[in-house]
Curated annotation (Swiss-Prot):
Catalyzes the attachment of proline to tRNA(Pro) in a two-step reaction: proline is first activated by ATP to form Pro-AMP and then transferred to the acceptor end of tRNA(Pro). As ProRS can inadvertently accommodate and process non-cognate amino acids such as alanine and cysteine, to avoid such errors it has two additional distinct editing activities against alanine. One activity is designated as 'pretransfer' editing and involves the tRNA(Pro)-independent hydrolysis of activated Ala-AMP. This is Proline--tRNA ligase. The keyword Ligase applies. Pfam families: HGTP_anticodon, tRNA-synt_2b, tRNA_edit. Its EC number is 6.1.1.15. Consists of three domains: the N-terminal catalytic domain, the editing domain and the C-terminal anticodon-binding domain. Homodimer. It catalyses: tRNA(Pro) + L-proline + ATP = L-prolyl-tRNA(Pro) + AMP + diphosphate. Keywords: Aminoacyl-tRNA synthetase, ATP-binding, Cytoplasm, Ligase, Nucleotide-binding, Protein biosynthesis. Its main location: cytoplasm. The keyword Metal-binding does not apply. It is found in: Cytoplasm.
Length: 568
C-alpha cells in the first residue's frame, strides 16, 4: 500500500483527555478517532487493519479448537434479560430503550441470554452436545466514566463464546481447553501475560480465570507468586493463614473501660498488643434487588483489611455502600465500639475465616467507651467467609513463598457457569433416558479492541507504538528519503514490487514530505521493520531498521531482499 493514498492523519498534538500511551499514540498515529469524547471511537484504515489482524489470530485459534462462529443481534429483547434475572441486577451500564411499538430492548453488553435462546431453540438431544459457539461482535456498556481510549470505552469489539454440555465434567474439560487456546492467542500476539484466579462478577458462575496483560498502567491489581504459577486478581486472591509471633494479651474475659479508642491504632496502643489480636468491625449497607438493603458488620482481625468484592459476594449483594455515623446510630450501633456479639436486632454479622477458633481476642462491646477482652471464637457458630484483602508479603497458598502485587490489563476472562443461565431460561436437552436436563455451560470472553491498547501499553517508547509481529498493520515500511531523486525512487519501486510479490504487506512511503517527517511517522506508527533508501544509495547501501530499540543497520542494496527475507 502506498502511503500517499492512505488515510493516515498523524498529528503531533496529544488529546487533552489522554493519559495512557496507547490512547495518545493510537489517536496521534491516526489509528482511531474519538467521536465527540463520549467513549466512542471510529477505526480509521490503519486501526481497522490492526483490529482485523488481531481478530484473525483470535478466530484462527478458536476454529482450531473446534469452536463455531455465529453472529448474534447487537439489539437484545429485554424479556430475555428478565428471564435470566439480570435485567435489574446488571445496573446502569445496561442501556435500555424502547422501539416505536413500545417494546423494550437493551444494547448487549454480553450475550449469555441471546446465545442460550439460540441454543434452546436448536438443540434438543444429548447427541448434539457438546457445542461451543462464539462471535466477534460489538458490545455496548454505558460506562459512567469512559476513559483511557480503547481500554475503557462504551462501545467495543469483543469475542464472546459459550459452550454447552451434558455434564459438569465435560464443561470443565472445555474450560481447560479454552484456557490453553487463550494462552496460544496471547502468545501469538507477542504479549507477556498471566493467567489468574478471578471473581466472576455480574456474569456469575462457580469459577473463573482472567488473562492479564502485564503493564504498569493496568487498572487491575493482581497478586502473583514468583516461586510458582499462582496468580489472582486482588478481588479473589487467597493466602496461607497468618500467624503472629507477638505475645497474645493475657487478660481474663471481661469488659474494660476504653475511652477515646475508636481506631485499631489507638486500641493497639491502649492494650499494648499487636493488631492481630484485635477484632476490626467494618459496617456496610448491603444493597439488593427491588431496593432492599440491610446493615452488615464484617468482622476480621485488626491486622487485616476488608476486600469489598469478597464481602459483597459473602452476602450475595449487588453492591455495598458506606454507612454514616447517623445511620449507625439509627441501627443501634456505636462507631469505634462495635463487636461481633450482642449486636442489635436487624444487623447481620459476617466473620472472616481467620477468626475461626481464634482466642485471646479484644473486640468492641457494642457500648460506648467499652471493649471486651479475652474473647474466644472456639466452637463459635457463625457466617464465616474469606473477607481479607491479600497484602504484599503474604504467603502463597500453593507453595508458601511471599507474594507481591503487580498491575495488569484484563484482556480475557473465562467462566464456569454451570446451569446459572440454562435453568431460568429453560435450555434443556433429553438425556439417554429421555429425561430433560439443564445444559451445563461455560463462557469465554476476549476484549478484541482492548487488545490493541494492551499491546501498545506493553510495547511502546517515547516516540510511539511498537507493534508485535502478528498485530502490526504492515510487515515492513519502505521509505524513500528524497522523492525527487530518481535513483532512490526507482529502487523503491523495484523493492516494493519484489517484496509484495513475496507476500509481504508493505507500506511504501512515497510522499513528498521531508525525510525527517517520514521518520517521525515511522516511529509513531510502530511498524516492526523499515527499509530506508537514502543518500548512502550512492555507495550502494540502504538502511534496515528494527522498530524495537530503533536498531539501524547498513545493508547493500543488492542484499536487502535476502536480509528482509531472513528477518521479517
Amino acid at each position: 500500500m502506498r502511503f500517499s493514498r492512505l488515510l493516515i492523519p498523524t498529528t503531533k498534538e496529544t488529546p487533552n483527555d489522554a493519559t495512557l500511551a496507547s490512547h495518545i499514540y493510537l489517536i496521534r498515529g491516526g489509528f482511531i478517532q474519538s467521536v465527540g469524547g463520549s467513549g466512542l471511537y471510529n477505526f480509521l484504515p490503519l486501526g481497522k487493519k490492526v483490529l482485523d489482524r488481531v481478530r484473525n489470530v483470535v478466530k484462527e485459534e478458536l476454529d482450531k479448537a473446534g469452536c463455531q462462529e455465529v453472529s448474534l443481534s447487537f439489539v437484545t429483547p429485554a424479556s430475555l434479560w428478565e428471564e435470566s434475572g439480570r435485567y435489574e441486577k446488571y445496573g446502569k451500564e445496561l442501556l435500555r430503550f424502547k422501539d416505536r411499538k413500545n417494546n423494550e430492548f437493551v444494547l448487549g453488553p454480553t450475550h449469555e441470554e441471546m446465545m442460550v435462546n439460540l441454543v434452546r431453540q436448536s438443540v434438543k438431544s444429548y447427541k448434539q452436545l457438546p457445542l461451543n459457539l462464539y462471535q466477534i461482535n460489538l458490545k455496548f456498556r454505558d460506562e459512567i466514566r469512559p476513559r483511557f481510549g480503547l481500554m475503557r470505552g462504551r462501545e467495543f469489539l469483543m469475542k464472546d463464546g459459550y459452550s454447552f454440555h451434558t455434564s459438569e465434567e465435560d464443561m470443565k474439560r472445555e474450560f481447560d481447553l479454552m484456557e490453553e487456546t487463550y494462552k496460544k492467542i496471547f502468545t501469538r500476539l507477542g504479549l507477556e501475560f498471566r493467567v489468574v484466579e478471578a471473581d466472576s462478577g455480574a456474569i456469575g458462575g462457580s469459577g473463573s480465570k482472567e488473562f492479564m496483560v502485564l503493564a504498569d498502567s493496568g487498572e487491575d491489581t493482581i497478586v502473583v507468586c514468583d516461586n510458582c504459577d499462582y496468580g489472582a486478581n486482588i478481588e479473589a486472591a487467597v493466602r496461607q493463614e497468618k500467624d503472629c509471633e507477638a505475645k497474645a494479651p493475657e487478660a481474663e474475659a471481661g469488659k474494660v473501660h476504653t475511652p477515646d479508642t475508636t481506631t485499631i491504632e489507638s486500641l493497639s496502643a491502649f492494650f499494648d498488643v499487636d493488631p492481630y489480636y484485635l477484632v476490626k468491625m467494618v459496617a456496610k449497607r448491603a444493597l439488593y434487588d427491588e431496593g432492599k438493603s440491610e446493615v452488615v458488620l464484617f468482622a476480621l482481625r485488626g491486622s487485616d483489611e476488608l476486600q469489598e468484592v469478597k464481602a459483597c459476594n459473602a452476602v450475595n449483594a449487588n453492591d455495598l455502600a458506606d454507612i454514616s455515623e447517623e445511620e449507625l446510630e439509627t441501627a443501634g450501633l456505636i462507631a469505634g465500639y462495635m463487636g461481633p456479639t450482642g449486636v442489635p436486632e436487624g444487623v447481620r454479622v459476617v466473620l472472616d475465616n481467620n477468626l475461626k477458633d481464634a482466642t485471646s481476642m479484644i473486640c468492641g462491646a457494642n457500648e460506648k467507651d467499652h471493649h471486651l477482652v479475652g474473647n474466644s471464637f472456639e466452637g463459635m457458630e457463625g457466617d464465616y467467609h474469606d473477607l481479607v484483602a491479600v497484602q504484599e508479603g503474604d504467603l502463597c497458598p500453593k507453595c508458601g513463598a511471599p507474594m507481591r502485587y503487580t498491575k495488569g490489563i484484563e484482556a480475557g476472562h473465562i467462566f464456569q457457569l454451570g446451569t446459572q443461565y440454562s435453568e431460568p431460561l429453560g435450555a434443556t436437552f433429553l438425556d439417554e433416558n429421555g429425561k430433560a436436563q439443564p445444559m451445563v455451560m461455560g463462557t469465554y470472553g476476549i476484549g478484541v479492541s482492548r487488545l490493541l491498547a494492551a499491546i501498545i501499553e506493553q510495547n511502546h517508547d517515547d516516540r510511539g507504538c511498537i507493534w508485535t509481529k502478528e498485530s502490526a498493520p504492515f510487515d515492513l515500511q519502505l521509505i524513500v528519503s528524497n522523492i525527487k531523486d530518481e535513483t532512490q525512487v526507482a529502487l523503491g519501486e523495484k523493492l516494493y514490487e519484489a517484496l509484495t510479490a513475496k507476500g509481504l504487506d508493505v507500506l511504501f512511503d512515497d510522499r513528498k514530505d521531508r525525510f525527517g517527517a517520514k521518520m517521525k511517522d515511522y516511529e509513531l506508527l510502530g511498524i516492526p521493520y523499515a527499509v530506508v533508501i537514502g543518500k548512502k544509495l550512492q555507495d550502494g547501501l540502504v538502511e534496515f531498521i528494527s522498530r524495537e530499540g530503533l536498531v539501524k543497520e547498513e545493508v547493500s542494496a543488492e542484499a536487502i531482499l535476502d536480509v528482509v527475507g531472513e528477518r521479517v
